[in-house]
Every structure is written in structure tokens, then in C-alpha cells.
Amino acid sequence: MKGKIPLAKLRKNRLFKVLSLALTLVILTGIFAGCGKEPEEETTTTTPPTTQAPTTEPYVTRSINPLTGEGNYPEELLKNRPVMISVENHKDARPQWGITDADIVWEMEAEGGITRMLLMFADASRIPEQVGPTRSARHYFVELVEGFDAIFVHFGGSPQAYNALDNHGTDHIDGMSDSGTFARDTSRNVSSEHRAYTTGEKVMKAIENKDFRTTLEDEYVNPFKFNTSPTKLEDGTCNQMVVAFSSYATYTYTYSEEDNLYYSSLNGNRFNDSDGNQQNFTNLIICYADKSSLGDKKGRISLDLSEGNGVYVSNGTYQEITWEKGDYSDMMKFYDADGKELSLNTGRTYIGIVASSRESECTIS
């Protein structure tokens, strides 16, 4: 970064200064000793000066939730793998279970303008008693999951999704083959595909039964940086953000100065969970991605997750950003206009991946 000295160079300069000072002291000692009266039959032994190698402060792991930045997170969970659960957003699936409990909510189109959410939990123990309705996977869901070293929970999938799961060896729990991990809610008068759900206890049991690795890979780096205090963004004011996935799913996020949260409405109606709680977030990240058709009879699509532009909204303000994912198993990262990694305000985050063709319909006011 411009204006900063690399750590290795800084250490080298410090060591050079210490050695130079030590050599000067030795020379001065010799000069003053030569000028004084030499003691009779006395020998002196000069001990060479020693220098202490530069030290660095030990790294201290803060016990914060790696997905929200919130404190008092159990330290024993810091190295555990996150879990991502596919939840549908068809009108017959609403209100959903557990969406306001997720640390991060991802959302993107499945097909026909209908969106699907990936509820992301920092650890399986954070999954509530009921989550759903769980629904099928898409191949670009798997691509996101892979980047976060997450365990994936879904109920079925497209042919492309199953190919991706097999090709990448993704640890996943599928309602089509792991029926004991899921149940059907009997209180709703809708077709069965809109009633499947799971629980935190069932997911943890399935992870144990499948002998999945529960800790993160050694090279894993936490996905987000967080500000130490609430921060305003530099591009302008955002009291309301419209996120237009399609005519079927258009959200309005309205800022509340009372609690610094953005509250969600879907197609003009409050977007509540099954407990009547309105969906709300501290951070909104909207990513614009190129969308293409797979050309099958189901109308399935693909989203290019390699890179793109977007907007970050928080604390009544916004700023334009860029994002990139790179290779299939790379983590999606977010950057400000200067190319520095984005730093979020502490709290829950919504990440919407919207077709680039809809960017002009996503407005800020």
C-alpha cells in the first residue's frame, strides 16, 4: 500500500540501527580507555554488546462472530465450519422459518424470476429449531458454498447442481437421500415441496453421522473485516434501497435511525418470518452479476460469479464497490473504490446477487 513500509524492510532498518549504535559504543569505549591512566597489573575483559531480535506481539484471537463481528462469541466455535441452508421464496413458502436467525442471508434468482435464499450460520449450533422451507440446490449455490468451506443443506437439486456437488466433493446434506434430517410441516395447506424444513439438532446429528470434517481448513481466512465502531460510508445518503430481482421479487429496504437497521418489504408488504418478525439487517451488499440461460425446459439460469460491481449500504449511507470470486472454490471478496477490502459495520448482513440487466432498477434514495 502506498506510503507504508513493508514489514521486512522495517525490521531490517531497525536491526541496522542497533548494530551501528553498538559499534559506535565499542569504538568510544576504546578511545576513552586509551586516554586514561592504565592500571597496574589489571586486565579488563570487554563483553561484546548483544542485540535483541525484533519481536512481534502475539496474535490474539478476538471472540467475535466471524460473520457478524458481534462479541461474546464462544471461543471454542471460532474454528468451526459454517453451514449454508437453501430456503425457497415462492409465495407458498412464506413466511419462512428461521430467516431472521441467520448470520448472513444470501439471495439470488433460481428461475422464472423466483428467488432462493442461502441462510448462512457461523456454526451448526446456531441453527434454530426450525429452518425452511428447504429447497433444491443450483450449481452457483454450490460455488458460493465451496468458497466458504461450508457444509451445505438442501432438498434436491438441478442436474448441474448435482454435477457440481460430485465434482468438488462438497460436504452436503440432501433431503432426497437424508430424509431423517428433514420433516414436513402439517400446519400449512400448501403442496409438500413448500413444507419441508430442518432443525439445528437434526443438522448437527447428520454432520456427525456422515463424519464430516467440522473444523475449517488450516488456510481458511475469515471472510469479513469489521469496523471497531459504526461508520458512515462516503458516497452519499441511503434511507431506502430498492433491490429488483424481478417483477416477482422486488424488495424495499428502509432505514431506521432508531436502531440503524434496514427493514425489508417484499413487493410492498412487510417481509416477516414465521414469528412475525420483520427481516432486518445492519449491512446490505448488492452484487450485480451477468445472467445467462441454460436453455433447458425448466428455464434454469446461470450466474457468473467471477467478478463484478455493486453497492454497500449501511448506517444510512452507501458506497459503490467491486467484488470478485475468481476460481470456483475461492471465497467471494468485496472491495471499496480504492481496491481495499471492504470493512463492515457490526451486525447481520444481506447479500443479494442481482442480474446485471436489472441494475438500473435497483435504486437508492
Task: Please report, for each region that a protein language model flagged, where it lies by residue.
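Hydrophobic alpha-helical membrane-embedded or membrane-associated segments
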Residues: 21-28
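Bacterial N-terminal signal peptides that target proteins for export
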Residues: 5, 9-21
